[in-house]
């Protein structure tokens, strides 16, 4: 019973890392897409 909170914290931490990584990837794709658009213009 005492081990549950630790597992929950671990999951929340990994989820936070996953979210931040996803945001970084989205930003990278967006920047690359916008730069290619400006390059075409």
Curated annotation (Swiss-Prot):
Domain of life (superkingdom): Eukaryota
Impact reported for residue 15 to A: Complete loss of CTL recognition
Residues annotated as signal peptide: none
GO biological process: adaptive immune response; cellular response to tumor necrosis factor; positive regulation of type II interferon production; regulation of gene expression
Keywords: Adaptive immunity, Immunity
Reported impact of residue 12 to A: Complete loss of CTL recognition
Tissues where this protein is expressed: Expressed in acute lymphoblastic leukemia B-cells and Epstein-Barr virus-transformed B-cells.
Impact when changing residue 13 to A: Complete loss of CTL recognition
Function: Precursor of the histocomplatibility antigen HB-1. More generally, minor histocomplatibility antigens (mHags) refer to immunogenic peptide which, when complexed with MHC, can generate an immune response after recognition by specific T-cells. The peptides are derived from polymorphic intracellular proteins, which are cleaved by normal pathways of antigen processing.
Official protein name in the record: Minor histocompatibility protein HB-1
Source species: Homo sapiens (Human)
């Amino acid at each position: 019973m005492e081990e549950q909170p630790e597992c929950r914290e671990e999951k929340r931490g990994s989820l936070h890392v996953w979210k931040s990584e996803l945001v970084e990837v989205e930003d990278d794709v967006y920047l690359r897409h916008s730069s290619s658009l400006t390059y075409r213009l």
